[in-house]
Amino acid sequence: MLILTRRVGETLMIGDQVSVTVLGVKGNQVRIGVNAPKEVSVHREEIYQRIQHERAMHEHLQHLDQDYQVSYEDDNYAQKNFNR
């Protein structure tokens, strides 16, 4: 991890397109501003983790739904062809 010291009003660059500026310090809180292109997502860590969790759950549910569809189609096939 790179550790930097910045004062209020000072900026650091991440690559060529992302800048992070220290806007203020009050007690143990630091306000920062992030300038980034629209295609770059910027989230607080706890929000990012929630998004990742929701994506994983959505993918899992889609996978379960696909498994159910295959199973349901197999059951229909079996009923049509073997229950005569």
Curated annotation (Swiss-Prot):
Belongs to the CsrA/RsmA family. Coiled coil: none annotated. NCBIfam families: csrA, PRK01712.1. Keywords: Activator, Cytoplasm, Repressor, RNA-binding, Translation regulation. It comes from Acinetobacter baumannii (strain ATCC 17978 / DSM 105126 / CIP 53.77 / LMG 1025 / NCDC KC755 / 5377). A key translational regulator that binds mRNA to regulate translation initiation and/or mRNA stability. Mediates global changes in gene expression, shifting from rapid growth to stress survival by linking envelope stress, the stringent response and the catabolite repression systems. Usually binds in the 5'-UTR; binding at or near the Shine-Dalgarno sequence prevents ribosome-binding, repressing translation, binding elsewhere in the 5'-UTR can activate translation and/or stabilize the mRNA. Its function is antagonized by small RNA(s). InterPro entries: CsrA, CsrA_sf. This is Translational regulator CsrA. Pfam families: CsrA. The gene is csrA.
